[in-house]
A protein has these predicted regions:
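Beta-rich catalytic cores
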Residues: 53, 107-109, 190-193, 273-275, ...
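N-terminal secretory signal peptides that target proteins for export/translocation
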Residues: 1-6
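Beta-rich carbohydrate-recognition and catalytic domains
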Residues: 23-106, 114-183, 200-272, 282-328, ...
Length: 386
């Protein structure tokens, strides 16, 4: 999405202000369709190859759509559209599994890509440190103890077919809470990133991260982060309140004593304490749309003119909206995202982070068994009205 000059930004700001006061309705415009069922590639790619992040996509230079929706062993998907994808069982990224929490490279999920015209793709990496399974000696407590999470940065130079850390670990770190790993601390840390979205008002890049529980001075909730340089993992700044993105993220290992307060993010109001699966700029609503799943329930929507002030999240798509034939394969909802296949042609958005009045909601379902219905990625057409 092309950034705007000062005059056009001012006009856009007035239009956004007018649009933000209107009521918004979101309704399903048709039944969900399966985009990928993990049982279809079970015997080829393995039982652990499942949708374990929200669905992401970008358009490569050759016109092929690349889709990311996987686990710690990353297999790419490609096809002519976001609806017609073929899974490749070659691993383009394998989790590092480093047992040192200060390296920020243990169990890694490749997520949130952003493509450039020259073939470079950067992606956020959700990185879990699980002392119950990776650290020696093993932790004798169970989750939510012995667990923390951070966000790193990966890069590809070939439109996503191969990946590496953007900088040698731990210097690929994007975001961490300012506290060292502690086995007795309840699960916490910045993780579960949304997609990266461009704000047309300032041309900067943003994403949302989630902290599950209070840790030190850091409250639980959603932190919005911003940068002008996607290639520099240290350039991201968290929201500090009063419209300012001035919170830097540093490694807590070796951080001077007493500095934690300078690295605490102000969490968003009106959003639940659950991960934001996807964010999109709506060219119809002139607002940002966020989709959220909490504890396996339905998908909630929230709207914002500026990524700071959000409406109270409201569940607008749930089990009752599914046809009976789909309900039998779904025990819970998870991993929502917004991908509009018309975005590339309509507004030049090769990262599918813009949506129009009619745009699909992507989401994943948990089934009954990995060998029968398993996890699936679905796409449901949604209609927006104001």
């Amino acid at each position: 999405m092309t950034s705007l000059g000062p005059a056009r930004r001012a006009l856009l700001g007035l239009a956004i202000l007018a649009a933000s006061s209107r009521a918004i309705t979101v309704t399903p415009a048709g039944p969900p369709v399966t985009v990928w069922a993990s049982v279809d590639s079970l015997h080829k790619c393995g039982v652990n190859d499942t949708p374990d992040i929200p669905t992401r996509a970008f358009l490569a230079g050759d016109g092929v759509v690349h889709m990311i929706t996987g686990s710690t062993s990353f297999h790419w998907m490609t096809g002519p559209t976001v609806f017609n994808q073929t899974r490749n069982c070659s691993s383009a990224w394998n989790s590092t599994e480093n047992p040192d929490p200060s390296v920020f490279a243990s169990a890694e999920w490749l997520d949130s890509p952003h493509v450039f015209d020259n073939g470079t793709v950067v992606a956020l990496v959700h990185t879990e440190f699980d002392a119950m399974n990776i650290q020696t000696p093993r932790c004798n407590l169970s989750y939510p103890f012995c667990w923390t999470v951070t966000i790193g940065l990966a890069v590809s130079q070939d439109f996503g077919f191969t990946w590496q850390h953007a900088r040698p670990p731990p210097h690929h770190l994007v975001a961490s809470v300012p506290y060292e790993f502690n086995r007795t601390q309840i699960a916490s840390g910045w993780g579960d990133p949304s997609n990266i979205v461009t704000n047309p008002a300032d041309g900067h890049f943003y994403f949302a991260a989630w902290n599950r529980n209070q840790v030190g001075l850091q409250q639980p909730g959603i932190c919005f982060m911003r940068t002008a340089d996607l290639t520099d993992p240290a350039s991201w700044r968290g929201y500090g309140g009063d419209g300012e993105y001035n919170v830097s993220f540093v490694s807590p290992y070796g951080m001077p004593p007493g500095d934690a307060g300078a690295h605490v993010c102000t969490v968003a109001k009106n959003l639940p304490n659950c991960p934001v699966g996807g964010i999109a700029w709506s060219t119809y609503l002139l607002q940002f749309v966020a989709v959220i799943c909490c504890n396996g329930g339905g998908v909630s929507f929230s709207f914002s003119p500026d990524l700071v002030d959000w409406t109270v999240a409201e569940e607008l798509y749930s089990f009752k909206d599914l046809p009976p034939a789909v309900q039998k394969n779904v025990t819970s909802f998870t991993y929502p995202s917004l991908l509009d296949p018309a975005a590339a042609a309509a507004v030049g958005d090769k990262n599918y982070n813009s949506i129009g009045q009619d745009a699909p909601l992507f989401w994943a379902s948990i089934g009954h068994s990995p060998y029968t219905d398993g996890r699936r990625v679905w796409s449901t057409p949604m209609h927006y009205e104001r």
